[in-house]
Amino acid sequence: MREETREQPAPLRSGLTTGSCATATSLAAARLLLTGVSTDAVSITLPKGKVVQMRLEFCRREDERAEAGTLKDAGDDPDVTHGALLYSQVRLQDEPGIRFVAGVGVGTVTRPGLVLAVGEPAINPVPRRMISEHLQQLADDCAYRGGFEVTVNVKGGEQLALKTMNPRLGILGGLSILGTSGIVRPFSCAAYIASIHQGIDVAHTNGYTHIAACTGNASEDTMRRVYGLPEIALIEMGDFVGAVLKHLRKVPVPRLSLCGGFGKISKLAAGHMDLHSRHSSIDLPQLAGWAADIGADADLQAAIMAANTSQQALALAHAAGIALGDAVCAHALAFARSVVPAQVQVEVFAIDRQGGIVGKAGMQ
């Protein structure tokens, strides 16, 4: 009998960005206007030269305009837009060039600080360039000297946008059309990190001198309670504290509060920039060592090293009168200060699962 072998996991499947979808649907609609040809698929060239073919759900003409739609395929990435219908409507115009319009489910920029001006549709620079290049090539091929009005839509985009950072960034009414490579890399986290940078940029540009970077909802609630900070000054960093600290080298906001659960703050204290369990773990011997530095005896150190969780280690220290939470925050503060510019004042809060503050260090 043949010995069974464990099945190898299939490689994660990449997808295509909303920018690629907008390019493909704009090209198909414009081609229908200029040539009368309607197809069920269209090929586009991505920024790095790769050619991809995208299936269309429809491509049709309605009076003075044409429209084409495709279903967003994010591959194996847990993208909020996966499966959404993205469609573009194109009209011809006398003036050369491209005029972009935010259609149904696509947001509009309402705050300064982003790469797009206030009032512009939230179609980012690379997707704009992709659309422009493809439509210009089509115009050249057809000897067309006019321009195009391109309206990009996402069915249900206004509701989907509530699951993103757009409302906090001041992008209202729907989603952003994104992408720099045209390809969605599964679990690359690039879009999340970009939203962190955008959040800092928007807060800074709008005159906020104090921001709070938080790992989740409980830490955000704590910062609201302590400082009364508005949404625009709250940066949802998740596990990506490094994205915050490094970006402050470019945009040195004067005051930074870091707030997260005790376990995650202990990882920051140990010098980790990514606090996710895939990339960093809680070092119980290190916690025991820090406890020893502030008076923990050998028995307490052994108990901390044998603890099941960081919260249990914290509880053991608290019961013995050892301020482990403050000590961990002090080490996290020292590491954060080593990354950000000297002019940025930093403080660190550690909280429990109920949002209670269990440690603090820094800025008074």
Swiss-Prot record:
**What GO molecular function annotations does the UniProt record carry, in alphabetical order?**
cobalt-precorrin-5B C1-methyltransferase activity
Q: Which domain of life is it from?
A: Bacteria
Q: Does the keyword Methyltransferase apply?
A: yes
According to its UniProt entry, the protein's GO biological process terms are: anaerobic cobalamin biosynthetic process; methylation
Q: In which pathway does it act?
A: Cofactor biosynthesis; adenosylcobalamin biosynthesis; cob(II)yrinate a,c-diamide from sirohydrochlorin (anaerobic route): step 6/10
In terms of InterPro entries, this protein maps to: CbiD, CbiD_sf
Enumerate the transmembrane spans.
Answer: none
- Key words, A-Z: Cobalamin biosynthesis, Methyltransferase, S-adenosyl-L-methionine, Transferase
Give the catalytic activity.
Co-precorrin-5B + S-adenosyl-L-methionine = Co-precorrin-6A + S-adenosyl-L-homocysteine
Q: What is its EC number?
A: 2.1.1.195
Of which family is this protein a member? Belongs to the CbiD family.
Recorded hits in NCBIfam families, A to Z, give: cbiD, PRK00075.1-1
Q: What is this protein called?
A: Cobalt-precorrin-5B C(1)-methyltransferase
The top of its lineage is: Bacteria, Pseudomonadati, Pseudomonadota, Gammaproteobacteria, Pseudomonadales
